[in-house]
């Protein structure tokens, strides 16, 4: 379907980002195809959306997401490795965790983020959710998915959103698993995470 968004305040995402008005955004098959003066717009082939002076901008991209968490700082230190083992140990807790992951992805979409890149997650949740969003059975942003990252023993996030590989054959096994899960990228978590307080 073709859409024409008119009567809005356009933020174009450029460095200067000055509000533009009096323009109509044309979208064909989900792709922005043109930005034309609103007054002269021939819109008979478009479904017209009147923005009534509201703001519109291109979708944002979040390039570093762990859907296993909501992004809020932890109030206290916890044993993430133990927590993940507990979550992944039964069908019930995996189902609950997956619903939470899907909810966190939906939160991203509702905040204006239309694409996310996941860089470490629980099992195959990220590719599973990506596929459900693409098929239209779940609501969320487009996902470039890594599923679990690959780390080393004692490495960053090893045992939680990354799998520790002790040897080259271990690492190759994890790469093969990622290939079977049809990930979009491989996340390596070899060094310790850098946190500034």
Model-inferred region functions:
Residues 1-43, 56-57:
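N-terminal metal-binding scaffold of metallo-dependent hydrolase/deaminase domains
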Residues 4, 46-50, 145:
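Conserved beta-strand scaffold positions in the cores of enzyme catalytic domains, especially
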Residues 8, 25, 30, 53, ...:
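Divalent metal-coordination and catalytic microenvironments
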Residues 11, 119, 189:
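Conserved residues at the C-terminal ends of beta-strands
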Residues 35-36, 70-71, 126, 153, ...:
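Glycine/Thr-rich phosphate-binding loops of Rossmann-like dinucleotide-binding domains
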Residues 44-55, 126-137, 170-182:
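Short amphipathic alpha-helices and their capping/turn segments at secondary-structure boundaries
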Residues 55-132:
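Metal-associated gating/positioning segment near the N- to mid-region
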Residues 137-197:
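Metal-coordinating catalytic core of metallo-dependent amide/deamination hydrolases
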């Amino acid at each position: 379907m073709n859409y024409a968004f008119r009567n809005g305040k356009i933020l174009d995402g450029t460095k200067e980002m000055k509000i533009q008005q009096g323009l109509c955004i044309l979208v064909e098959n989900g792709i922005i195809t043109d930005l034309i003066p609103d007054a002269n717009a021939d819109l008979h082939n478009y479904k017209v959306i009147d923005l009534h002076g509201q703001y519109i901008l291109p979708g944002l991209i979040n390039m570093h997401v762990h859907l296993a968490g909501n992004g809020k700082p932890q109030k206290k230190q916890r044993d993430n490795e133990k927590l993940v083992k507990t979550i992944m140990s039964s069908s019930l807790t995996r189902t609950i965790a997956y619903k939470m992951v899907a909810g966190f992805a939906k939160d991203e979409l509702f905040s204006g983020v239309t694409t996310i890149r996941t860089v470490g997650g629980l099992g195959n949740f990220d590719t599973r959710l990506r596929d459900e969003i693409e098929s239209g059975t779940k609501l969320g942003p487009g996902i470039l998915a890594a599923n679990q990252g690959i780390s080393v023993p004692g490495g960053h996030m090893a045992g939680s959103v990354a799998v520790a590989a002790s040897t080259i054959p271990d690492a190759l096994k994890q790469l093969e698993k990622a290939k079977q899960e049809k990930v979009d990228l491989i996340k390596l978590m070899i060094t310790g995470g850098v946190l500034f307080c």
